[in-house]
Amino acid sequence: QVEDIRELIGDLTLAKLQNIFNSIIKRQENKVDPIRSKFGKIEKEEVSLEDKMSDLELYAGTHHYFSFRGLLERQPGKIQVIVTFLAILELMKTGVITIEQEHLFDDIQITSLIYEEQQADGETGSSD
């Protein structure tokens, strides 16, 4: 477990995370699907935080570095963006990933800590 939240997020502030999150949400709202926009009723989409965390852990196991913005932009809808955002926060809290931002307004880079562990396990050739 991560002892110090400041060590976890470095100079990244909640305001920076919120700005990126808000810009992604705004883009999701501005997307118009020509087929779905004509529907009278949209079905409720069930999205599980646990499932999203599992999906992200699998992704982190095969990708050492990936983009926060890119990850959110690939989500098909607003609910998916929100749940993905929450899953990222949970994975940071549990020490599966870390995040960093080089400069103000730069994209946030996510680093997978389990990718590094899996690579180290693969190099030792353990066959438990």
What does each of the following model-derived ranges do?
Residues 1-128:
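Long, charge-dense, low-complexity tracts
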